[in-house]
Amino acid sequence: MKHEEKKGTVSIELVESSLALSRRRGVDDASLLAQAGIAGALLAQPNARVSARQYGALWNAIARALDDEFFGQDSHPMRCGSFIAMSQAALTARNGLRALARAVNFMHCVLDDLHAQLDASAERVRLRFVHRNSANPPEMFAYATYFVIVYGLTCWLIGRRIPLLHASFRCGEPRAVHEYRLMFCDDMRFDEPDSYVDFDPAFAALPIVQTAQTLKPFLRDAPASFIVKYRNPHALGERVRARARCRPPRGRPRARSPRGCTWPRRRCGAS
């Protein structure tokens, strides 16, 4: 599948990785898949993909079933509602770096085994993962879950995607490595001494552009709105792409509005 065709979708391998965590706690796949609108037959198709919205719905269904927004990957659960509280705490931060720091500190208060530390310089902002020595070493999916939560929130708060420079992990290369490279960045290494993600530092001083009014729709759509890679739906590029998706195929008759401008008969997204 071409890279462009993968945008906005998630590999069935990540669906399987998510379900494996809920199975360990005796939760049946069928109910979770039904809530997400994912056909069970897709699990037998290694090249299948689901939409970000479907995977986001599965994410939320598993979190509700386990009452754990970290999917049981830490000895202390991240109870349902934790992400809401984290978002509210980070919303009043001064800038991007402080917002990320608040999210990381919140996770430190919630989880027992996996923590992160921030190290900022002129060249990069490093999110370094630290895990309790007595705990089992985290798998790649645990790192990714943590990252998606704090990264997705921070990108939304500043209204733009933060470029990633490099990522290193202590765990071995996962089976779905191609999917994790889409999630993180191309420069991604495994079996390394330390686990960390380097951010482009330009985001650090950017102001928070979200408000209490925009928080509600963000939480309603989370994590589907950032589960793949955060996109600001109000940015010019996204508006241009949305307009292009709404255009009818070449040669298709176009309706004319009362004001004389042309537009498809059906609005984009209308049923």
Task: List PLM regions with ranges.
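DNA-contacting interfaces and partner/effector-binding or oligomerization modules
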Residues: 115-206
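Residue-level recognition of alpha-helical structural elements
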Residues: 11, 25, 29, 51, ...
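Short coil/loop linkers at secondary-structure junctions
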Residues: 28, 39, 69, 160-163, ...
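Short hinge/gating elements
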Residues: 84-90, 132-136, 204-205, 225-226
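Extended mid-to-C-terminal alpha-helical interaction segments
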Residues: 179-271
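Generic alpha-helical segment signature
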Residues: 11, 76, 96, 143, ...
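Short polybasic/polar patches that bind polyanions
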Residues: 23, 34, 156-158, 182, ...
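N-terminal low-complexity or simple alpha-helical regulatory segments
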Residues: 1-126, 149, 174
